[in-house]
Curated annotation (Swiss-Prot):
One of its GO terms (biological process) is NAD biosynthetic process via the salvage pathway. The modification Phosphohistidine is found at H221. The keyword Ligase applies. SUPFAM superfamilies: Nicotinate/Quinolinate PRTase C-terminal domain-like, Nicotinate/Quinolinate PRTase N-terminal domain-like. GO terms for molecular function: nicotinate phosphoribosyltransferase activity. Keywords: Ligase, Phosphoprotein, Pyridine nucleotide biosynthesis. It is an enzyme of class 6 (ligase). Transiently phosphorylated on a His residue during the reaction cycle. Phosphorylation strongly increases the affinity for substrates and increases the rate of nicotinate D-ribonucleotide production. Dephosphorylation regenerates the low-affinity form of the enzyme, leading to product release. This is Nicotinate phosphoribosyltransferase. CDD domains: PncB_like (cd01401). Pathway: Cofactor biosynthesis; NAD(+) biosynthesis; nicotinate D-ribonucleotide from nicotinate: step 1/1. It comes from Erwinia tasmaniensis (strain DSM 17950 / CFBP 7177 / CIP 109463 / NCPPB 4357 / Et1/99).
Length: 401
């Protein structure tokens, strides 16, 4: 299938902010670390038929470079150091790092190489897969249809919140990875900027730059996964990851992701020093109400006022779920809502893809993600899962994918 040969990705900044934020930390601290990542389709979609077209699109990515205007934009932000940005100017995607196959109808993708380079593949590659598939399945869909759907949801949102003080409600666009298309995401976020006063930013650097809104994002599971092999001891790997992040970003980007090895294990490592230093926590699996209560209780046990901290909710959210969480928590702790697929691929008759790319190896050794939702568990090596479970005193883990 090669109907759409024109490049879908046209800028290096069409990615999520946390990828550049993590890449800078890897560039400074783990320059020679190597990793392998793999694609997973959590649904039943047989996506192998798109392999040839994806190979062509991946080849196109080798020509993407940071433009002078984009360099100036990144230089104006408080996150980046000059040595990293100068290196990023020289960065080129290397398609030889990516193996794409159609295995009996299933799409198989494996990415291997230096972490500082591999780290940038995940988000644009997922966006690419999503857009290629939706172009074939729903060629008639336009950005206007997505905006029409959004506007009806915003009317429903007004009705849901008419009795609420919304002054503390904040929304972020997290829609890049599973969007219908770049044009749909841009149209949706543009509409939110115009019609939704609670929008505070986008995870997509290109869209944030175009619309003059804040780029948002800190770190992903891979930051914690890689430290399972970078850290000299497995028991200390989460603390090592948390400390390395603070060393790179001592006074900003202070939201920590909690569910790489379950939230309970994370909170045991998230002691007073980390809890004071970090601005807050991000939820990405498991029951969000239960998680939020655990987080508040943890801060209270450490004699930290929860109202001085922030919880970011980002797991399979829509506006209705966000309102429910806001009602429950907003008077006790600051809350922000990151909504992805339900903004950038919420179109009648369109089924979003449930796809991910996750680390499976670091320096040739296994890493794992054992989240608060067993269906999201990822690891090849059962012995390593057992070692991780023992190191963090976890209950029996359901079958890894």
């Amino acid at each position: 299938m090669t109907r759409h040969a024109a490049p879908i990705l046209t800028t290096l900044l069409d990615t999520d902010a946390y990828k550049l934020h993590m890449q800078q930390a890897v560039f400074h601290r783990y320059y020679d670390v190597t990793v392998t990542a793999e694609f997973r389709c959590r649904g039943e979609d047989m996506l192998g038929i798109y392999a040839d077209e994806l190979v062509q699109q991946i080849a196109n990515m080798a020509s993407l470079t940071l433009t002078d205007n984009e360099f100036a934009y990144l230089s104006s932000l408080p996150f980046f150091k000059t040595d990293y940005l100068n290196w990023l100017r020289t960065f080129r995607y290397n398609p030889e790092q990516v193996t794409v196959q159609n295995l009996q109808g299933k799409l198989d993708i494996r990415i291997s190489g230096p972490w500082r380079e591999v780290i940038l593949w995940e988000v644009p590659l997922l966006a690419l897969i999503s857009e290629v598939v939706h172009r074939h399945r729903s060629p008639q869909i336009t950005p206007e249809q997505a905006v029409s759907r959004l506007k009806s949801k915003l009317e429903q949102f007004k009705r849901l919140t008419c009795d609420l003080d919304m002054s503390r409600f904040r929304l972020m666009d997290f829609g890049t990875r599973r969007r219908f298309s770049h044009d749909v995401q841009l149209a949706v976020v543009s509409t939110l900027k115009q019609d939704f006063p609670w929008l505070v930013g986008s995870s997509n650097y290109d869209i944030a730059r175009r619309l003059n809104i804040a780029p948002v994002g800190t770190q992903a599971h891979e930051w914690f996964q890689a430290h399972q092999q970078i850290s000299p001891t497995l028991e200390n790997c989460q603390r090592a990851a948390l400390q390395a992040w603070l060393d790179e970003y001592p006074d900003r980007l202070g939201i920590a992701l909690t569910d790489c090895i379950t939230t309970d294990a994370f909170l045991r490592d998230f002691g007073s020093e980390f809890a004071h230093a970090y601005q807050g926590l991000r939820h990405d699996s498991g029951d969000p109400f239960e998680w939020g209560e655990k987080a508040i209780a943890h801060y209270q046990q450490l004699n930290i006022d929860p109202l001085s901290k922030t919880l970011v909710f980002s797991d399979n959210l829509d506006l209705d779920k966000a309102v429910g969480l806001y009602r429950h928590f907003e008077q006790r702790i600051n809350v922000i809502f990151g909504i992805g697929t339900r903004l950038s691929c919420d179109i009648p008759q369109v089924k979003p893809l449930n796809i991910v790319i996750k680390l499976v190896e670091c320096n040739g050794k296994p890493v794992a993600k054992l989240s608060d939702s067993p269906g999201k568990t990822i690891c090849h090596d059962k012995a390593f899962v057992r070692a991780l479970r023992k190191a963090f005193d976890l209950p029996r883990v359901k079958k890894a994918s």
